[in-house]
Each structure stands twice: as C-alpha cells, then as structure tokens.
C-alpha cells in the first residue's frame, strides 16, 4: 500500500525537505534488513546521501532551520552507515 505523506515541497530556494533524505535512508535500512540490496550498493548509496547532506550543511547561505533538519538527517544516515559497516 502506498501512503501519501505530508511533505514540504521544494522551498523557494529550490532545496528539498529533510524528509526526502530520511525516506531514502529508511528505504535503504529496510532493504538491508530484508537483504534485498547488496551491502556494497547500500554503502555506496548511504555514502552519496551523507556527502550530499554534508555539502548542503556546509553552504553558508543555508537557512538555519534547514541546516538543523539536514544535520538530523545526516546523523540518521551516519547511524545506518555504521550499522552497515558492522554487517560487512
């Protein structure tokens, strides 16, 4: 069943809500748990997500409310990255 979530659309600055990143991390977490993704692929995707979030957080023009939300998403991604590393 596909449930519609209330997500913030792209903001006026063109940046996505942190929910999109959290959804991606949760999707990879579920795939790893269900063993429906190769560990190497999961590592690569999570690496890309953490690098993207890190770059966005490093932007000095990023509004503080977005920075805080992205930092939270980055922390969740780092936790999954550590979980995947323990599986290897």
Language model regions located:
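Short E/K-rich amphipathic alpha-helical oligomerization segments
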Residues: 41-59
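A structural signal for well-ordered alpha-helices, especially hydrophobic packing surfaces
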Residues: 28-32, 53, 57, 74-85
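Short, charged, amphipathic alpha-helical segments
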Residues: 43-47, 64-72
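Charged, low-complexity interaction regions
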Residues: 33-41, 58-65
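Short intrinsically disordered terminal tails
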Residues: 1, 84-88
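Long, low-complexity or tandemly repetitive, helically biased scaffold regions used
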Residues: 2-8, 55-58, 68
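N-terminal acidic leader/helix
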Residues: 2-40, 80
């Amino acid at each position: 069943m596909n449930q519609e979530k209330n997500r913030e659309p792209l903001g006026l600055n063109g940046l996505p809500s942190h929910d999109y990143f959290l959804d991606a991390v949760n999707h990879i977490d579920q795939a790893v748990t269900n063993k429906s993704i190769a560990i190497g692929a999961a590592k690569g995707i999570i690496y890309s997500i953490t690098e993207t979030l890190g770059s966005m957080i490093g932007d000095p023009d990023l509004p503080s409310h977005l920075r805080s939300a992205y930092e939270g998403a980055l922390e969740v991604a780092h936790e999954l990255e550590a979980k995947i590393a323990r599986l290897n």
